[in-house]
Protein backbone atom coordinates (compact mmCIF):
# COMPACT_ATOMS: atom_id res chain seq x y z
CA UNK A 1 0.00 0.00 0.00
CA UNK A 2 1.31 3.47 -0.91
CA UNK A 3 1.29 6.12 1.80
CA UNK A 4 -0.62 9.29 1.03
CA UNK A 5 1.22 11.23 3.74
CA UNK A 6 3.51 13.97 2.56
CA UNK A 7 6.98 13.06 3.85
CA UNK A 8 8.18 16.64 3.32
CA UNK A 9 5.47 17.87 5.68
CA UNK A 10 6.60 15.42 8.37
CA UNK A 11 10.22 16.56 8.00
CA UNK A 12 9.19 20.21 8.19
CA UNK A 13 7.19 19.55 11.35
CA UNK A 14 10.18 17.81 12.92
CA UNK A 15 12.44 20.71 11.98
CA UNK A 16 10.05 23.30 13.40
CA UNK A 17 9.51 21.24 16.56
CA UNK A 18 13.29 21.00 16.93
CA UNK A 19 13.64 24.76 16.42
CA UNK A 20 11.06 25.37 19.15
CA UNK A 21 12.89 23.01 21.51
CA UNK A 22 16.20 24.78 20.80
CA UNK A 23 14.69 28.21 21.43
CA UNK A 24 13.32 27.02 24.77
CA UNK A 25 16.58 25.30 25.72
CA UNK A 26 19.15 27.83 24.49
CA UNK A 27 17.30 31.02 23.59
CA UNK A 28 16.78 32.51 20.17
CA UNK A 29 20.26 33.94 19.75
CA UNK A 30 22.02 30.64 20.51
CA UNK A 31 19.79 28.45 18.38
CA UNK A 32 21.75 27.12 15.41
CA UNK A 33 20.94 25.20 12.26
CA UNK A 34 23.33 22.49 13.44
CA UNK A 35 21.45 21.96 16.70
CA UNK A 36 18.07 22.08 14.96
CA UNK A 37 19.28 19.45 12.47
CA UNK A 38 20.58 17.24 15.27
CA UNK A 39 17.32 17.42 17.22
CA UNK A 40 15.20 16.91 14.09
CA UNK A 41 17.40 13.98 12.97
CA UNK A 42 18.00 15.53 9.55
CA UNK A 43 21.04 16.96 7.80
CA UNK A 44 21.72 20.68 7.69
CA UNK A 45 21.32 20.67 3.87
CA UNK A 46 17.80 19.29 4.42
CA UNK A 47 16.99 22.41 6.43
CA UNK A 48 18.75 24.74 3.99
CA UNK A 49 16.70 23.30 1.11
CA UNK A 50 13.61 24.61 2.88
CA UNK A 51 14.86 27.83 4.51
CA UNK A 52 17.91 29.95 3.64
CA UNK A 53 18.93 30.74 7.22
CA UNK A 54 17.93 30.55 10.88
CA UNK A 55 15.84 33.73 10.69
CA UNK A 56 13.61 32.10 8.08
CA UNK A 57 13.20 28.98 10.22
CA UNK A 58 12.19 31.09 13.21
CA UNK A 59 9.84 33.20 11.08
CA UNK A 60 8.16 30.01 9.81
CA UNK A 61 7.93 28.68 13.36
CA UNK A 62 6.23 31.91 14.48
CA UNK A 63 3.82 31.73 11.55
CA UNK A 64 2.87 28.16 12.40
CA UNK A 65 2.42 28.96 16.10
CA UNK A 66 0.39 32.13 15.52
CA UNK A 67 -1.81 30.52 12.87
CA UNK A 68 -2.20 27.57 15.25
CA UNK A 69 -3.51 29.85 17.99
CA UNK A 70 -6.02 31.31 15.55
CA UNK A 71 -7.23 27.75 14.88
CA UNK A 72 -7.28 26.89 18.62
CA UNK A 73 -9.51 29.85 19.45
CA UNK A 74 -12.66 29.15 17.47
CA UNK A 75 -14.76 31.75 15.72
CA UNK A 76 -17.42 32.84 18.20
CA UNK A 77 -20.03 33.93 15.70
CA UNK A 78 -20.86 37.13 13.86
CA UNK A 79 -20.91 40.50 15.49
CA UNK A 80 -18.62 42.88 17.30
CA UNK A 81 -18.82 41.20 20.73
CA UNK A 82 -17.85 37.80 19.32
CA UNK A 83 -15.04 39.32 17.26
CA UNK A 84 -13.62 41.25 20.22
CA UNK A 85 -13.83 38.18 22.48
CA UNK A 86 -11.91 36.09 19.96
CA UNK A 87 -9.21 38.72 19.41
CA UNK A 88 -8.70 39.10 23.16
CA UNK A 89 -8.47 35.31 23.57
CA UNK A 90 -5.92 35.04 20.74
CA UNK A 91 -3.86 37.85 22.28
CA UNK A 92 -3.93 36.14 25.67
CA UNK A 93 -2.70 32.87 24.13
CA UNK A 94 0.13 34.67 22.35
CA UNK A 95 1.15 36.55 25.52
CA UNK A 96 1.52 33.14 27.17
CA UNK A 97 3.33 31.46 24.26
CA UNK A 98 6.93 30.80 25.30
CA UNK A 99 8.28 30.84 21.75
CA UNK A 100 6.56 34.09 20.73
CA UNK A 101 7.64 35.79 23.94
CA UNK A 102 11.19 34.49 23.64
CA UNK A 103 11.51 36.04 20.18
CA UNK A 104 10.04 39.35 21.36
CA UNK A 105 12.29 39.56 24.41
CA UNK A 106 15.49 37.86 23.27
CA UNK A 107 15.70 38.56 19.54
CA UNK A 108 14.78 42.23 19.28
CA UNK A 109 16.36 42.63 15.84
CA UNK A 110 14.22 39.83 14.44
CA UNK A 111 11.10 41.02 16.28
CA UNK A 112 11.57 44.61 15.08
CA UNK A 113 11.35 43.49 11.46
CA UNK A 114 7.74 42.44 12.11
CA UNK A 115 6.95 45.25 14.54
CA UNK A 116 8.24 48.21 12.57
CA UNK A 117 9.37 47.28 9.06
CA UNK A 118 7.00 44.88 7.32
CA UNK A 119 4.04 42.58 7.72
CA UNK A 120 4.89 38.96 8.26
CA UNK A 121 2.86 36.07 6.92
CA UNK A 122 1.23 35.46 10.29
CA UNK A 123 0.24 39.12 10.58
CA UNK A 124 -1.35 39.00 7.14
CA UNK A 125 -3.22 35.83 8.14
CA UNK A 126 -4.53 37.66 11.22
CA UNK A 127 -5.54 40.76 9.22
CA UNK A 128 -7.40 38.58 6.71
CA UNK A 129 -9.23 36.76 9.53
CA UNK A 130 -10.06 40.07 11.18
CA UNK A 131 -11.29 41.54 7.89
CA UNK A 132 -13.58 38.57 7.35
CA UNK A 133 -15.05 38.88 10.85
CA UNK A 134 -15.32 42.67 10.55
CA UNK A 135 -17.16 42.30 7.24
CA UNK A 136 -19.60 39.87 8.88
CA UNK A 137 -20.08 42.30 11.76
CA UNK A 138 -20.72 45.15 9.33
CA UNK A 139 -23.37 43.14 7.51
CA UNK A 140 -24.93 42.32 10.88
CA UNK A 141 -24.83 46.01 11.89
CA UNK A 142 -22.64 45.82 15.00
CA UNK A 143 -19.37 47.03 13.39
CA UNK A 144 -18.89 50.51 11.96
CA UNK A 145 -18.47 51.15 8.27
CA UNK A 146 -15.04 51.22 6.70
CA UNK A 147 -12.73 49.02 4.70
CA UNK A 148 -12.55 45.71 6.61
CA UNK A 149 -8.84 45.26 5.86
CA UNK A 150 -8.03 48.78 7.10
CA UNK A 151 -10.03 48.21 10.28
CA UNK A 152 -8.42 44.79 10.66
CA UNK A 153 -4.93 46.25 10.29
CA UNK A 154 -5.67 48.80 13.01
CA UNK A 155 -7.06 46.08 15.29
CA UNK A 156 -3.84 44.14 14.69
CA UNK A 157 -1.74 47.16 15.71
CA UNK A 158 -3.77 47.70 18.88
CA UNK A 159 -3.66 44.03 19.82
CA UNK A 160 -0.03 43.46 18.84
CA UNK A 161 1.07 46.20 21.24
CA UNK A 162 -0.57 44.38 24.16
CA UNK A 163 1.19 41.15 23.19
CA UNK A 164 4.57 42.85 22.93
CA UNK A 165 4.34 45.22 25.88
CA UNK A 166 2.10 43.62 28.51
CA UNK A 167 5.08 42.75 30.69
CA UNK A 168 6.20 46.38 30.67
CA UNK A 169 2.94 47.57 32.26
CA UNK A 170 2.29 44.53 34.47
CA UNK A 171 2.67 46.72 37.58
CA UNK A 172 -0.43 48.63 36.47
CA UNK A 173 -2.31 46.03 34.43
CA UNK A 174 -2.34 42.35 35.32
CA UNK A 175 -3.37 39.77 32.71
CA UNK A 176 -7.07 40.12 33.49
CA UNK A 177 -6.94 43.91 33.35
CA UNK A 178 -5.06 43.77 30.02
CA UNK A 179 -7.86 41.62 28.61
CA UNK A 180 -10.55 43.99 29.92
CA UNK A 181 -8.83 47.10 28.57
CA UNK A 182 -8.00 45.51 25.21
CA UNK A 183 -11.63 44.47 24.91
CA UNK A 184 -12.77 48.05 25.64
CA UNK A 185 -10.30 49.51 23.16
CA UNK A 186 -11.33 47.16 20.36
CA UNK A 187 -15.03 47.42 21.13
CA UNK A 188 -14.88 51.21 21.12
CA UNK A 189 -12.85 51.30 17.92
CA UNK A 190 -15.23 48.99 16.07
CA UNK A 191 -18.52 50.38 17.40
CA UNK A 192 -20.82 52.06 14.84
Question: What kind of feature is each model-predicted range?
Answer:
Residues 3-5, 59-86, 123-126, 135:
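Amphipathic alpha-helical linker/stalk segments
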Amino acid sequence: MVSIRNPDSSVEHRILDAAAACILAYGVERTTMTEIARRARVSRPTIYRRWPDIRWVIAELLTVRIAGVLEQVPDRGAGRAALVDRVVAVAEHLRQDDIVQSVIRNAPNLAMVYIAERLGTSQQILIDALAEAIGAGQREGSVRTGDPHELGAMCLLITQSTIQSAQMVSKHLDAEAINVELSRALDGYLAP
